[in-house]
């Protein structure tokens, strides 16, 4: 995931000042741009010198061949005149004046200079890449410039009644329908572990089927992805911070051979976007085949580092969940990817409108975008039991930022193109099932249970097609109020004081 290096090169039509400005708008370090430009300039000089040295080496070999052909004496003099040691001014005429033994010595010295130059070039290349992968994509002009998403995310539109309030939150409702085992899940799987069971399993499967059917009718190809990826491929689709904050590492045997003692490092996927992005790695995609649209289905695994204390109860924010994802490879020309961007968020909106979930669409501020996104719109559903908007969908246009490192090129072959171009890649959540379940539970709660949204009824089993009944009391109704807790603690304290006073009185009587 990187920008085009030519964007940093003024002589190639690039504009480093624009990228520096983008970094500032993202509230990231603009100094990375200057460091990259410096490393790249030195790298280009180093490569130019290496090319010239290789030409000189070939010239030495050619000159030796010509002298041997003429049967000139080889000589045994390895002394090299000082002017010859200045390789920048070395010419064919200068070499012709030397003996074969001297030219061989010069060739060895050139070899040493090439090795030194190559070592320096590799070092500069690594330095350049370290800076390049931490510089974000160019921003779309409509992105709000701010580093405070709580205050400055721009609401683009609202659908449905986002003011209504209801009694219970999803934390209680998952228990009331007996569809969740949280404490036992935590014992088995650790923090945020859970068992989804009973009616909520059916509801989850109904959502998956409905989401896939909806996308299938819009030309998306359903695709069930691998759950883990090789490290070198994951590095091409995920930014560096994700390896520390989001991704789970899996260590396994290097091969299926019993005597193989090597180990292989893989990473569990955080979203099906990651393996689908790599599906056409190292390919040329023909213009007539675009757009290519996939409906990704996978289990997703996320560490949620940095979310300590947030949404610790229920199933809204968990380490493992099912998700259906929209993923599109688009043409980089004629604004096609931005038209597709609007189409994808529109598809998500139609899906949640059909489920009767109120929401608003927010344009995410520049400081909260990941490196790849040029623009991101979120669909945040209204949760009437919690009295808050919560994110259900993220839709991003990454333009050619992801495709460049994955080498997914646009067109036929390099021979057919004046310049190599890369496809644009877009992703959008269709349905993260556990979050959507939470939204349905809060919006469709009644005194007796949860009304099943009409669009999901055909996918539900008999007896659960219209209403999911409450079978357990709400945990919040069983918890003592703060006042009751205070009174109870006060009574215990008073009883303890009375007991202590009685003991002291008994001690006095005994002593007397």
Swiss-Prot record:
Residues 500-512 have a biased composition (Polar residues). Pfam families: Seryl_tRNA_N, tRNA-synt_2b. L-serine binds at residues 271, 302, 325, 427, 429. Residues 9-61 are annotated as: Interaction with tRNA. Its main location: cytoplasm. The record marks 429 as: Important for serine binding. It catalyses: tRNA(Ser) + L-serine + ATP = L-seryl-tRNA(Ser) + AMP + diphosphate + H(+); tRNA(Sec) + L-serine + ATP = L-seryl-tRNA(Sec) + AMP + diphosphate + H(+). Coiled coil: none annotated. The modification N-acetylmethionine is found at residue 1. The modification N6-acetyllysine is found at residue 323. It is found in: Cytoplasm; Nucleus. Pathway: Aminoacyl-tRNA biosynthesis; selenocysteinyl-tRNA(Sec) biosynthesis; L-seryl-tRNA(Sec) from L-serine and tRNA(Sec): step 1/1. Residues 479-499 have a biased composition (Basic and acidic residues). One of its GO terms (cellular component) is cytosol. The keyword ATP-binding applies. InterPro entries: aa-tRNA-synt_IIb (IPR002314), aa-tRNA-synth_II (IPR006195), aa-tRNA-synth_II/BPL/LPL (IPR045864), Ser-tRNA-ligase_type_1 (IPR002317), Ser-tRNA-synth_1_N (IPR015866), SerRS_1_N_sf (IPR042103), SerRS_core (IPR033729), tRNA-bd_arm (IPR010978). Residues 472-512 are annotated as: Disordered. A motif (Nuclear localization signal) lies at residues 482-494. The modification Phosphoserine is found at residue 241. Its EC number is 6.1.1.11. Keywords: Acetylation, Aminoacyl-tRNA synthetase, ATP-binding, Cytoplasm, DNA-binding, Ligase, Nucleotide-binding, Nucleus, Phosphoprotein, Protein biosynthesis. Catalyzes the attachment of serine to tRNA(Ser) in a two-step reaction: serine is first activated by ATP to form Ser-AMP and then transferred to the acceptor end of tRNA(Ser). Is probably also able to aminoacylate tRNA(Sec) with serine, to form the misacylated tRNA L-seryl-tRNA(Sec), which will be further converted into selenocysteinyl-tRNA(Sec). In the nucleus, binds to the VEGFA core promoter and prevents MYC binding and transcriptional activation by MYC. Recruits SIRT2 to the VEGFA promoter, promoting deacetylation of histone H4 at 'Lys-16' (H4K16). Consists of two distinct domains, a catalytic core and a N-terminal extension that is involved in tRNA binding. Belongs to the class-II aminoacyl-tRNA synthetase family. Type-1 seryl-tRNA synthetase subfamily. This is Serine--tRNA ligase, cytoplasmic. It comes from Cricetulus griseus.
């Amino acid at each position: 995931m990187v920008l085009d290096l030519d964007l940093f090169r003024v002589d190639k039509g690039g504009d480093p000042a624009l990228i520096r400005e983008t970094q500032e708008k993202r509230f990231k370090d603009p100094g990375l741009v200057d460091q990259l430009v410096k490393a790249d300039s030195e790298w280009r000089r180093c490569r130019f010198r290496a090319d010239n040295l290789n030409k000189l080496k070939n010239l030495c070999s050619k000159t030796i061949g010509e002298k041997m052909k003429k049967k000139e004496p080889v000589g045994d003099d390895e002394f090299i005149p000082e002017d010859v040691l200045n390789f920048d001014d070395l010419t064919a005429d200068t070499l012709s004046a030397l003996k074969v033994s001297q030219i061989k010595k010069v060739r060895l010295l050139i070899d040493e200079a090439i090795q030194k130059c190559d070592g320096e070039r590799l070092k500069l290349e690594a330095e350049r890449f370290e800076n390049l992968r931490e510089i974000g994509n160019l921003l779309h002009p409509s992105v709000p410039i701010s580093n405070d998403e709580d205050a400055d995310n721009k609401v683009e539109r609202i659908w449905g009644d986002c003011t209504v309030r209801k009694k219970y939150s999803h934390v209680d409702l998952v228990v009331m329908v007996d569809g969740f085992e949280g404490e036992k899940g935590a014992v088995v799987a650790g923090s945020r572990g859970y068992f989804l069971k009973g009616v909520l399993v059916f509801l989850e499967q109904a959502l998956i089927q409905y989401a896939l059917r909806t996308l299938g009718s819009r030309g998306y190809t359903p695709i069930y992805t691998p759950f883990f990826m090789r490290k070198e491929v994951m590095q091409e689709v995920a930014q560096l911070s994700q390896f520390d904050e989001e991704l789970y590492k899996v260590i396994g045997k290097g091969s299926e051979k019993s005597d193989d003692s090597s180990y292989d490092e893989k990473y569990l996927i955080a979203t099906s976007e990651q393996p689908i992005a790599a599906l056409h790695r190292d390919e040329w995609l023909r213009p007539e085949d675009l757009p290519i649209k996939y409906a990704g289905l996978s289990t997703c695994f996320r560490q949620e580092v940095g979310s300590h204390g947030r949404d610790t109860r229920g199933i809204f924010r968990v380490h493992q969940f099912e998700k259906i994802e929209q993923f599109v490879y688009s043409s980089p020309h004629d604004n096609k990817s931005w038209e597709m961007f609007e189409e994808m968020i529109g598809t998500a909106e139609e899906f949640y409108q059909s489920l009767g979930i109120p929401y608003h669409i927010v344009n995410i501020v520049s400081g909260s975008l990941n490196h790849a996104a040029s623009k991101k719109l979120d669909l945040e559903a209204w949760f009437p039991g919690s009295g808050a908007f919560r994110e259900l969908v993220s839709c991003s246009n990454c333009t050619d930022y992801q495709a460049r490192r994955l080498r997914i090129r646009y067109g036929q072959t390099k021979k057919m193109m004046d310049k190599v171009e890369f496809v644009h890649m877009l992703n959008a959540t269709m349905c993260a099932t556990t979050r959507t379940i939470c939204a349905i539970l809060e919006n469709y709660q009644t005194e007796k249970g949860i009304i099943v949204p009409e669009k999901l009824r055909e996918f539900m089993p008999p007896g659960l097609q219209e209403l999911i009944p409450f079978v357990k009391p709400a945990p919040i109704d069983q918890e003592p109020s703060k006042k009751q807790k205070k009174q109870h603690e006060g009574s215990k304290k008073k009883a303890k004081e009375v007991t202590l006073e009685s003991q002291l009185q008994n001690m006095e009587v005994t002593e007397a």
